[in-house]
Curated annotation (Swiss-Prot):
Record keywords, A-Z: Cytoplasm, Ribosome biogenesis
Keyword Cytoplasm: yes
Gene Ontology BP annotations: maturation of SSU-rRNA; ribosome biogenesis
Pfam families: RBFA
Function noted in UniProt: One of several proteins that assist in the late maturation steps of the functional core of the 30S ribosomal subunit. Associates with free 30S ribosomal subunits (but not with 30S subunits that are part of 70S ribosomes or polysomes). Required for efficient processing of 16S rRNA. May interact with the 5'-terminal helix region of 16S rRNA.
Protein name: Ribosome-binding factor A
Main localization of the protein described in the UniProt heading: cytoplasm
GO cellular component: cytosol
Species this protein is from: Salmonella typhimurium (strain LT2 / SGSC1412 / ATCC 700720)
């Protein structure tokens, strides 16, 4: 029977929690004025590298998102040192931050579906209204 949760997945899950706490309590960069959420962490099999996926509250401005990712990338050494103190790992992985737009895309798709359903309901209730124009 194969392991459902291997060590990289367990470490990634714990690392996601720890990075979220660090970003909330320790990072005071003004470029991260918006609230930052860690949406996921992917670890390499040897635990030497970690991809950290983040989302930002008020992420409408693309320049602010780029500045936020750059600020996180520049603070990755500091975050890594705090991770080393918080987690018992022989090697603290090298962190790379990425913007996760899946939440934004999911909301956009949900809005599209809602609009289509609403439009379909309107046409079903008033089928003759569209022919009168």
């Amino acid at each position: 029977m194969a392991k459902e949760f291997g060590r990289p997945q367990r470490v990634a899950q714990e690392m996601q929690k720890e990075i979220a706490i660090i970003l909330q309590r320790e990072i005071k960069d003004p470029r991260l004025g918006m609230m930052t959420t860690v949406s996921g962490v992917e670890m390499s099999r040897d635990l030497a590298y970690a991809k950290v996926f983040v989302t930002f509250l008020n992420d409408k401005d693309e320049d602010a998102v780029k500045a936020g990712i750059k600020a996180l990338q520049e603070a990755s050494g500091f975050i890594r040192s705090l991770l080393g103190k918080a987690m018992r790992l022989r090697i603290v992985p090298e962190l790379t931050f990425f913007y996760d737009n899946s939440l934004v895309e999911g909301m956009r798709m949900s809005n599209l579906v809602t609009n289509v359903v609403k439009h379909d309901e309107e046409r079903r209730v008033n089928p003759d209204d569209s022919k009168e124009d």
